């Protein structure tokens, strides 16, 4: 409960600058950030960071966000339970083999946390108080963007989140917060909260900036005389009028290691999107197109 309240507070303040803009999207998953700074407080810093960043990625509209490992584990457990026959069957029963894979993985570590506390306000939890009206806070984060197909780090960056200015206390008291009491309404005004928000904003900006350098591709799923069906839709940011190159894609493989070095398309033509659904789109017909051919944004 505590980390979800924190995530909601931070994401609401930062996602507006990254509103969806019709970009072609990729699936992405955030893994838990290791708390190498050994900072302790009323919330788990590594868990909270993953929750905050996952929520910000969703709110940005620029990614297809896959649930964190614990959420996917819960989904797989439900699928396993359904296979035992102990739950009612039907169209809504969870089925195996349908989890969306993550193309990109976000991993990192919290390397340093520094907090100078002032008097008044803050959070209280089991005898621990965070923040206050005065003082400052700083959080150092190292973030990695990993290609899930190869395990290679595509990009990395170190960010430093700083509280910057004095905090205010809005005040919220009561037991409904699961032990987290005090000025929860002022989390974003708390020095540690402001530092975390600043670091999250920088991390999100870094991830969005990497999109132009990551190849986007799809496949032809169905060929008819008057149209093609491609396995990408509104979920991936496809819009009516977009143009895609279609052709046979060959992978260039390192004969020594088996690593895929690159891919090359033998283009047969370009199609235009005429209709879009959530996971698929329809395009103009193309002579010579075959099911399974590759699809890239038109150059």
What are these regions (language model features)?
Residues 19-89, 94, 99-102, 152, ...:
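A structural "domain/chain start" motif
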Residues 69, 157-159, 264, 271:
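Short hydrophobic alpha-helix segments
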Residues 79-154, 164, 173-178, 239, ...:
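Surface-exposed short loop/turn segments
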Residues 1-8:
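Bacterial N-terminal signal peptides that target proteins for export
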């Amino acid at each position: 409960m505590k980390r979800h309240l924190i995530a909601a507070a931070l994401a609401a303040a930062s996602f507006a600058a990254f509103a969806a803009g019709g970009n072609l999207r990729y699936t992405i998953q955030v893994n838990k950030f290791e708390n190498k700074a050994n900072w302790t407080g009323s919330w788990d810093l590594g868990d909270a960071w993953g929750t905050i960043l996952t929520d910000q990625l969703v709110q940005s509209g620029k990614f297809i966000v896959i649930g964190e490992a614990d959420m996917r584990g819960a989904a797989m457990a439900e699928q396993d339970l359904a296979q035992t026959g102990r739950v009612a069957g039907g169209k809504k029963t969870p089925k195996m083999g349908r989890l969306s894979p993550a193309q990109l993985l976000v991993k990192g570590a919290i390397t340093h946390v520094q907090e100078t506390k002032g008097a008044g306000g803050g959070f209280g939890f089991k005898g621990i108080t965070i923040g206050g009206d005065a003082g400052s806070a700083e959080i150092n984060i190292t973030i990695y963007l990993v290609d899930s197909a190869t395990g290679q780090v595509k990009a990395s960056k170190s960010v430093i989140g700083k509280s910057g200015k004095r905090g205010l206390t809005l005040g919220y008291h009561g037991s409904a917060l699961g032990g987290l009491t005090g000025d929860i309404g002022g989390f974003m005004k708390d020095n540690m909260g402001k530092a975390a928000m600043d670091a999250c904003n920088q991390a999100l900006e870094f991830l969005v900036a990497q999109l132009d350098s990551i190849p986007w591709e799809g496949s032809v799923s169905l060929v008819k005389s008057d149209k093609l069906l491609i396995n990408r839709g509104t979920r991936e940011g496809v819009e009516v009028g977009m143009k895609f190159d279609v052709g046979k894609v060959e992978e260039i493989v390192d004969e020594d290691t088996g690593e895929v070095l690159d891919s090359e398309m033998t283009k047969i033509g370009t199609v235009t999107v005429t209709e879009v659904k959530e996971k698929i789109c329809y395009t103009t017909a193309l002579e010579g197109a075959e099911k399974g051919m590759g699809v890239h944004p038109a150059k």
